[in-house]
Amino acid sequence: MALPVEEWRRSAARCWAALEPALRERLAAAPLGEALRMGCGLFGPEEAALQRLCRRARTGKEPAAARFYREEGNRQFGRCCYRDAVRLYSQAAAHEPPRSPEVALCFANRSAALFHLGHFEVCLEDIARAESHGYPDRLLPKVLLRKAECLLRLGRLQDATDTLTAVENKMAVDGIMTSPIHRMLLKKLSQLKTEIHEGSCPEPAREADGDVQRESEIWEENGSISGASSSLSLNFSTERGRHLVASQDILPGQNLLKEKAFVSVLCPGEGDSLLLQDSSETVWDTRVTNADLYCHHCLKQLLASIPCCGCSYAKYCSQNCADVAWEQYHRTECPLGALLLTLGVFFHVALRTVLLAGFSEVSRLVEWSRDDSNKDLCNAEAGGEHPSEALDTRAGRKVIPGCNDNGQYQSSYQAVFNLLPHVEKHSPEHKFLCMLSIVAICKKLQETGLEAAVLNGESSTTGSEQKTCGKTSDELSPELMIMAEAMLRHVLQLQCNAQAITVMQELESGDGAVVNKKPVRLATAFFPVLSLLNHSCSPNISVSFSGTAATVRASQPIPSGQEIFHCYGEEMLCCSSEACAFSVSRERLSQRLLDLQQQMEKALELLRDSKADEAIKMLLKCQIDARNFLSPEHLLMGELEDHLAQVYATLGKWQEAARHLGRSIQLVEMHHGPSSVEMGHELFKLAQILFNGFAVSEALSTIQRAEEILSVHCGPQSTQIQELQEMKTCLLELPRSILQRT
């Protein structure tokens, strides 16, 4: 959810409509700072409505929720659903107070589930966490035995021996134990000692490395654009604004840019399950969202999360990420969690941007932008009457907006600040909504006593110990007004400059013989250098992500002098490319299309419930319905073929699956092109089907095509390329007689 919840948007719209026409005109024409000053007085009557909406977004630590998730975790553990148990114990830990026996119990329970999943190193980390948070002394022998078994599985015999000695000493100090549980512990202790003595431990287990992409390509970095290849140059014109062009011929697959986001904020997920409907009955949600799956700081996929000490929302992959996030921004965001979820990701990004930049830098640039002598420099890209290059009168030379004093364009706050907000292109009503929302954030900072921390960057206590010694006032302090002006600028910038960080996420389906993945929006970010690329629905580059870092590669040959184009998504910008030259009104078909999509989703639910035959019947009916109002070339027709292929693959009917996927591939090629990343993902699925169906020659040729395409878009070290190479190796190792037959 990029923008606020619908109820707040409606509330702001009613407030705007009720204003006197003259005041609306003044607000519409006012500079950002002046609009905010007027908005402070208008926010008061709307504050209660926003507070009521914020109560639906539950981000505090609630003991009742902790009990619920822990009991659900125990239930899943009893069913041997260890992965679900890990997730539920993590949610329970997020609701427990830090350094308490209750949170220690969550970590200990989670360590047991991790042990059964074979994640022995992570299991050891959870055992250490349980001990450090005050795990009950009487229960310690059980987790110490688990620790010894992990060490044994990892081949660390001496450490395992030392741990068993500690267990023996502990049990001896506690005296004679005759209960069934104690007898079981003694039996386990004896068994582990025997295994160590006989040296019968298995080969040391290797933990999965995860989706780590290793870059081996050597390239020459650009001296003027941080993170960019020397094959690019930065140009400027009134028509195109700042843009990147090829300074030499570029080949497909060539790396053009490697940039870490200046700021990124995790998107909660498609379901927005943290935003509950008004209800007197408390219902805890067990659905999985991005907030449960990825680190809120580095965006690494989570296995055993570290919860924030102050809220139940933020989760991290390591204590280091938790500490860095706290020091840089989360100590301020933590008490504002419900408000930020209610207002949406764009406002969260705006706040985090100014927190990372710091008041000193924000103040410098806001004051600079207010200076009349710099208005041409700030607005040089707006088009019209401004010269093709802006003149920095202080330096006496022409510069491109966003560059530093040395003429370098860096991935810095100055570059972020100089991205165009396109104030004149936003409707007055939308600007009013954004202004009210920014005022709400700053008022909350003022009321909760966080203003000093925001302005001075001073360290503060943990979230559970935050002091609410703030003040209430209809006006913001001059310093907060500066921060508010910058935040409002950033929210308006995001409409055209936000970059979605996406990941390929596996979909739940069938027996796992064929891995079905789809791109999922993981986070919203500012990439100052990547934002130099103008939009086109026919881009000539592909962007892939690893954590918060973006890698840009050429997706086709780019001759010297040609502009580099990126597709930001159809909701962002108007586009003059050939792909967008014609638009068809779908208003009359929208409801029918929505009904069809809902039926397709029901079919996939049947597949997830192992009702493949029923899923096929429903999908075939969807096909008949679709043919009545969609063209044969519509992308949804391809999705139907893709889903049918998925169901037949689950049933092991590989030829049928390949036939349906082949039809899907034809439509993907028609819409996205034969060398598109979408084509690469479809060929990857076809390769899996042909591999499982033992169609060796077809599988090998499909693997080669998929490799050629995906290596261009994702790099030669991506996970999918490695899986394709493993399939190829397996097929080539088959006996020659089998290869000749197939």
Curated annotation (Swiss-Prot):
UniProt: S-adenosyl-L-methionine binding residues: 110-112, 418, 534-535, 568
Residues noted as binding Zn(2+) 2 in the record, renumbered to the chain: 308, 311, 330, 334
UniProtKB keywords: Cytoplasm, Metal-binding, Methyltransferase, Nucleus, S-adenosyl-L-methionine, Transferase, Zinc, Zinc-finger
Residues bound to Zn(2+) 1: 295, 298, 317, 321
GO biological process terms, semicolon-separated: heart development; methylation
Listed Gene3D superfamilies: Tetratricopeptide repeat domain (1.25.40.10)
Domain SET: 230-569
Enzyme Commission designation: 2.1.1.-
InterPro entries recorded: SET-MYND_domain_protein, SET_dom, SET_dom_sf, SMYD4_SET, TPR-like_helical_dom_sf, Znf_MYND
Sample GO molecular function, one term: methyltransferase activity
Zinc finger annotations (MYND-type) as residue ranges: 295-334
Substrates-to-products reaction catalysed: L-lysyl-[protein] + S-adenosyl-L-methionine = N(6)-methyl-L-lysyl-[protein] + S-adenosyl-L-homocysteine + H(+)
Protein's UniProt keywords contain Ubl conjugation: no
Keyword Cytoplasm: yes
SUPFAM superfamilies xref list: HIT/MYND zinc finger-like, SET domain, TPR-like
CDD domains named in the record: SET_SMYD4
Enzyme class: transferase
GO CC annotation terms, alphabetical: cytoplasm; nucleus
PROSITE patterns, per database record: SET (PS50280), ZF_MYND_1 (PS01360), ZF_MYND_2 (PS50865)
Location in the cell: Nucleus; Cytoplasm
A Pfam family reported for this protein in Swiss-Prot or TrEMBL: SET
Family stated for the protein in its record: Belongs to the class V-like SAM-binding methyltransferase superfamily.
Role according to the record: Protein-lysine N-methyltransferase. Monomethylates PRMT5, modulating its transcriptional activity. May also act as a histone methyltransferase. Plays a critical role in cardiac development. Acts as a key epigenetic regulator of gene expression during cardiac development via its dual activities as a methyltransferase and negative regulator of HDAC1.
Stated name of the protein: Protein-lysine N-methyltransferase SMYD4
Organism for this UniProt entry: Gallus gallus (Chicken)
